[in-house]
């Protein structure tokens, strides 16, 4: 299913850096080995990070030893504690947190949050006030500009607001419970 959907969506397999698995029921994890194998056949060389309940670790290791010898890339397993909210992945633009879910077995959802970006510079104002490039980052970070004549140009005149950061919560296979709405 996963590989078919990726192909239908025209998402390049090489763009996938991480896989997040909520729990160890077959419809959520059986496709992982096929995906790993396909990545290998396509010549992947960059690491693939797998975030999942800790119980997957030994099974993944055994299956990798059995079916995926000779891969040209590393599969890095990250055990996720399904009992608490915690940051499991972070880079310069994204944070992924686990969300405990109420299911028959250990299960968590994932909250994907973009980090806020800086405001956009109004190029026409930069040109108009002859602001040197070396000051652009200060302005993006909220600084006003003082002209050679001593006039202070407010930051709001030099920038436009950044787009609002987006978030997506993946919460499947759970019974409703009150705390869930406060986490997402």
Locate each region found by the language model:
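Active-site metal-binding loops of divalent metal-dependent hydrolases
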Residues: 1, 24, 55, 125, ...
